[in-house]
A protein has these predicted regions:
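Conserved aromatic beta-strand anchor motif in extracellular beta-sandwich/beta-rich domains
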Residues: 65-69, 211-215
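Short, solvent-exposed, Trp/other aromatic-anchored flexible loops in extracytoplasmic proteins
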Residues: 74-144, 216-262
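Positively charged n-region of N-terminal signal peptides that target proteins for export
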Residues: 1-4
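Transition segment at domain starts
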Residues: 21-42, 139-188
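Contiguous beta-strand segments within globular domains
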Residues: 36-50, 58-60, 100-102, 185-192
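A short beta-turn/strand-edge loop motif at beta-sheet boundaries
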Residues: 53-60, 111-113, 198-206
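C-terminal motif of bacterial Sec signal peptides marking the signal peptidase cleavage site
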Residues: 15-18
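Short beta-strand/loop motifs in extracellular/secreted proteins, especially
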Residues: 61-63, 170, 205-209, 251-253
Length: 262
């Protein structure tokens, strides 16, 4: 009876030692990628491990991760411990089904920066068992970006609209302005102005005013004209036709309106 228990004890020890040393059997790091998970508001760093024969396996490993955006800002640095429970089968259209580790990073742990794209650098290792060189993958249009600030003129602001002869054809009063910063994919800024036509007729077809957008250093970023169609005296309007695409996250802008010059 003692021999029976001794044999089974040795079997259990061997099985446990085999599970615990799985990191030492790892020979290959492969199939890494990075994505944002909209449903859970976090990020996933995927990678696969394989033995010397290319057979996928799981292992308890540590992962040093740092994320640097395209503005050369380090927005994340940390170490995650990965267990065999973090491995599973994942399917993609490009690679089919793969056995991968899913290392999750909460969105709140990644700082907002000046670019939504960048690189994810990571090193997979386990002390006294396995050590891989640092590798990287792309983070495309998924990193958090900073808000922008826009300063407007003091309102109300009366702007004269001149005709070809230089005479005042109408007066447009700007009563307010606001902005919307869209962070999805390519950042863009939408400016909405509200106001009233104080004088003039609708015979000209449209009233035209000009705008300019400056950055915090005083450089002109964008300029153009706003066309207000078929307004009669006393008509109120709301215009959101100004959409600017060349926007830097985290920047402070000044938006100025002026009379159009022929």
């Amino acid at each position: 009876m003692k021999r029976f228990f001794l044999v089974w004890g040795l079997v259990i020890v061997l099985l446990l030692s085999g599970c615990g040393s799985s990191a030492s059997r790892v020979e290959t790091l492969k199939s890494w990628s990075f994505q944002y998970n909209e449903g859970t508001s976090d990020y996933s760093l995927f990678f696969g491990l394989a033995d010397k024969n290319g057979k996928p396996l799981s292992a308890d490993v540590d992962v040093d991760i740092r994320i640097v955006n395209d503005a050369n800002e380090e927005v994340y640095a940390g170490t995650k411990s990965v267990s065999t429970d973090d491995f599973g089968y994942y399917t993609s259209q490009a690679a089919g089904e793969q056995y991968l580790a899913n290392v999750r990073i909460p969105a709140a742990e990644i700082k907002a920066g000046k670019s939504a794209s960048g690189k994810v650098y990571f090193t997979v290792y386990k002390e006294n068992a396995v050590q891989f060189d640092e590798v990287n993958c792309d983070a495309l249009y998924c990193l958090p970006i900073e808000d922008v600030q826009v300063t407007f003129d003091s309102f109300p602001l009366d702007l004269k609209v001149k005709d070809f002869m230089g005479s005042t054809a109408s007066v447009i009063q700007i009563q307010g302005a606001e902005f919307k910063f869209d962070k999805d994919y390519s950042p863009q800024l939408t400016i909405t102005i509200t106001g009233e036509k104080k004088s003039g007729s609708s015979d000209s077809g449209y009233d035209m005013i000009s705008y300019k957008l400056y950055d915090s250093a005083g450089y002109l970023v964008d300029s153009g004209n706003i066309y207000l169609s078929s307004l009669s005296a006393g008509d109120k309007f709301k215009d959101d036709s100004v959409v600017i695409y060349d926007i830097t996250p985290g920047e402070s802008y000044t938006f100025q309106l002026s009379e159009y010059s022929w």
